[in-house]
Amino acid sequence: MNELILNLKGDVSVPVEMDKIIPEKIQEMSLEKISGIELIQGNKTAKVSEIFDVELKESPVSKVTINNCCKKVKRIGEKMTSGEIVVNGDAGMYVGVEMKGGKITVNGDAESWVGQNLKGGEIIINGNAENYVGSAYRGDWRGMSGGKITITGTAGSELGEYLKGGTIVIKGNTKIMPGIHPNGGMIIIEGDIEGRAGGEMMKGAIVVYGKTLEPLPSFKFEGIVEDPLVKLFKKDAGTQLKGTFIKFSGDYVNTKPKGQLYAAIENNKNLI
């Protein structure tokens, strides 16, 4: 196994697309061949060696490390199926788009569309993420279907749009409309939200530990629950929550919805 180490040479003014640099694609390549890969940069292309200083060394796992990264470096880990990518610095849009396996860790902030249409694997952003975490392509009604995304900081609007499966965990606050149009999966928000969670929710679960505004009027109050076991489908082993929660079901703009919304009572006594 090899680890590819890419050290960004300097400031990047025109976005660079990194979809050709994923662990399974570069494993059998020589240093010379990797250095010569053409990356899309704006309306032109540039060789890897023109943008990065390139190193290759043996590793127990197939791995790509990008150092001094910035938000002009886009599409990191797109469609990867195995191995590991570590980004030291910020990352541009589309981290882990259509990823099926492996692990991506960003030690910095990330722009919008983290884990768009994620199918498997794990993405960890050790910082903040912008809008549409774990969401669908524009115009598509099939979003993230598997895997796990963890944001240790804050997240923007409309995370989990059209979520079908998998888990999204936000350690900080989120903006408006988390979990819009979901048909499965679980969203756990440990911070506060600006409201309108679960709009047009059909299936799935949203758990809010921080403060939230009053749920949409098309959600139904189900009662107070203690340490609930949240099941997303009949044969699901379930996710055990700890604490006391206010439970709502919805969204009743749909016919026979099975969506679940939990708000920690400690921070949301105004909802009772």
Curated annotation (Swiss-Prot):
GO MF term set = formylmethanofuran dehydrogenase activity; transition metal ion binding
> Does the entry annotate any disulfide bonds, and if so which pairs?
none
Q: Which Gene3D superfamilies match?
A: Glutamate synthase, alpha subunit, C-terminal domain
User: What residue ranges carry the coiled-coil annotation?
Assistant: none
A Pfam cross-reference name = GXGXG
Q: Which GO terms describe its biological process?
A: methanogenesis, from carbon dioxide
Q: Where are the sequence repeats?
A: 77-89, 96-108, 115-127, 141-153, 160-172, 179-191, 198-210
Q: Which reaction does it catalyse?
A: N-formylmethanofuran + 2 oxidized [2Fe-2S]-[ferredoxin] + H2O = methanofuran + 2 reduced [2Fe-2S]-[ferredoxin] + CO2 + H(+)
Instruction: List the keywords (alphabetical).
Output: Methanogenesis, Oxidoreductase, Repeat
EC number annotated for this UniProt entry = 1.2.7.12
Pathway-wise, it operates in: One-carbon metabolism; methanogenesis from CO(2); 5,10-methenyl-5,6,7,8-tetrahydromethanopterin from CO(2): step 1/3
Q: Cross-referenced CDD domains, in alphabetical order?
A: FwdC/FmdC
Say what the protein does: Catalyzes the reversible oxidation of CO(2) and methanofuran (MFR) to N-formylmethanofuran (CHO-MFR). This enzyme is oxygen-labile.
UniProt family annotation: Belongs to the FwdC/FmdC family.
According to the record's subunit comment, the protein's assembly and interactions are: This enzyme is composed of seven subunits fwdA (65 kDa), fwdB (53 kDa), fwdC (31 kDa), fwdD (15 kDa), fwdE, fwdF and fwdG.
The identity of this protein, by name, is Tungsten-containing formylmethanofuran dehydrogenase 2 subunit C
Organism equals Methanococcus maripaludis
Encoding gene (name): fwdC
